[in-house]
């Protein structure tokens, strides 16, 4: 082997190592938490997801014991401003969606009489979101990009596309630790 061949071989080996190290340190996502509007059915969830370029197989688990906020209110901007003035109003997560805002609530607000009075006074309905957990892959513990997890950049693209859908309230990413 001549000197140039050895240099090329060493360069290729170093480049391969760098690529492998970089790939192993990329942030990966194992699943999505998606909250859909009230009364969205599992077949509708499947139809919605089929319209997006999800690069791996996935399974859908709707309304399991997923504890992220399950309730919401839809209101226009004027109504939101009125709510903020009420002394019994508690600040919560607000999202802008089309011509209205969505106020996401945790289950702790539901039994609160003051909160329910504010809703009734403002003619607003408390709705229960359909919460789905979208598992990437086949459940294997080995996390291989393109098989049972996706890179963060792909997950963010999917999230952004899904959040444009009228039936989708919010999308969260379930990152792989380590």
UniProtKB/Swiss-Prot annotation:
InterPro entries per record: UPF0228
One Pfam family matching this protein: UPF0228
Membership in a protein family: Belongs to the UPF0228 family.
Protein's name according to its UniProt entry: UPF0228 protein MM_0401
Organism, scientific name: Methanosarcina mazei (strain ATCC BAA-159 / DSM 3647 / Goe1 / Go1 / JCM 11833 / OCM 88)
